[in-house]
Structure formats: C-alpha cells, structure tokens
Design a protein with these regions (language model features):
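Short Gly/Pro-enriched turn/cap motifs at secondary-structure boundaries
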Residues: 166-172, 186
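Short, well-ordered beta-strand segments
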Residues: 3, 43-45, 51, 120
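Conserved beta-loop-beta connector loops within the AMP-binding
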Residues: 178-192
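Conserved AMP-binding/adenylation subdomain of ANL enzymes
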Residues: 26-43, 51-91, 105
C-alpha cells in the first residue's frame, strides 16, 4: 500500500511526485535506526515541516526504537541551540541553510552540541567551507544523504567527511547502486 507522496522540485532532474510504500518506509526506519545508531535513549529533533522527508527521517526511526521525538514549530537557530542544550538532543536533521544560520550565531561553542551523536544533512550538497565549519564548530558526527526525495540511497558517513569531500558516499544498508550512461546502459566499475 502507498504510504505517502513526496514532491520534488526537480533539483537533480524533472519535478515529480515520488510514491513511497509502507514496506519502503518500514525498511527505511529499520536501516536508518541501524546506520545512524538510533535506540530507545535517542532524543531526536526534527527541524523541518511535517511534509518533509527530513521530518520522516527523524520521526520513523525514533518511534521505531522507542526514542523521544521533539518537533520544532518553525526553525530559529537560537531556539534550535537552546533545545539541543536543554534536552540533550542526540539526533537531528538540518538542511544546508539551517546550518548556515546556526554557524552565524555569535559566540558559537562546540560544547553546546556535545550531546549530538548523529547530525544529518540533505536537500542539497554542503559547500566545502560550510561542511568544514560544521565539522569544526558543531559536530564531527555528520551524515550527508543523497537522493533524498526518493528516500535516499547513498550516505557519506562521519569517518569519510574529510577524506572524501565531494563524494555522495556509499549505498545505504539494503541498497544496491548502479551507474548508467546517457543511453541507459550500466557502466563497468571505475567508469562514469
């Protein structure tokens, strides 16, 4: 059965509605819980609107493992920081403009974010300077997700952030990836 439809503006292709099934979302919750260390002690903060995949990215794995979910009613950088510090948030999702707003706060201190075990970014690639500032000033526990509207298929994990700038990462647990050429034929390894 269909679960929801996520609409894409066509950033990387043609605008479309992506139908997601209950089975796909169930797999998504399970694989995300494993890949990003969600557990019953997790305190997850969603910063995006309820129709966003970012919200589902926090909500489903958190509820799947019996964690606690916090939902912001609109994003404000100072309120985000205050909530992370006060509630000792362990998992959060932000889009690149939200990171920029946080990084522009005066007297930003990395210890404000010490409770964060997983910081997720998607929606558009992080610029290298923004990524370096996130890693230095917020958290080194950064995961970047790609193919987000479709449910995402690749992930750049924290240990690869500085080693593989510009990479889209590796396939998410349970996914296989193939590269095709402009004629739709599968490419051999090491060919793009």
């Amino acid at each position: 059965d269909n679960f929801n439809i996520i609409y894409s503006s066509g950033t990387t292709g043609v605008p479309k509605g992506i139908v997601q099934t209950h089975r796909a979302r169930s797999h998504w919750a399970t694989s995300n819980a494993i890949e990003m260390s969600f557990n019953s002690e997790s305190k997850s903060l969603t910063t995006t609107a309820l129709y966003s995949n970012g919200t589902w990215l926090m909500m489903l794995p958190t509820l799947f493992v019996g964690g606690t979910l916090y939902v912001m009613n609109g994003f404000d950088a100072k309120s985000f920081v205050d909530l992370v510090k006060r509630e000792q948030i362990t998992h959060t999702f932000l889009v690149p403009p939200q990171f920029s707003m946080i990084l522009s706060l005066e007297s930003l201190q990395k210890d404000w974010f010490s409770s964060l075990k997983t910081v997720l970014s998607a929606g558009s690639p992080l610029r290298p300077d923004i990524k370096e500032n996130i890693l230095s000033a917020i958290s080194e526990n950064l995961f970047e997700l790609y193919g987000f509207s479709e449910g995402f298929a690749t992930m750049l994990k924290p240990h690869d952030q500085r080693k593989k700038f510009g990479s889209v990462g590796t396939p998410v647990l349970g996914f296989e990836i193939k590269i095709i050429d402009e004629k739709g034929r599968e490419c051999s390894p090491n060919v793009a």
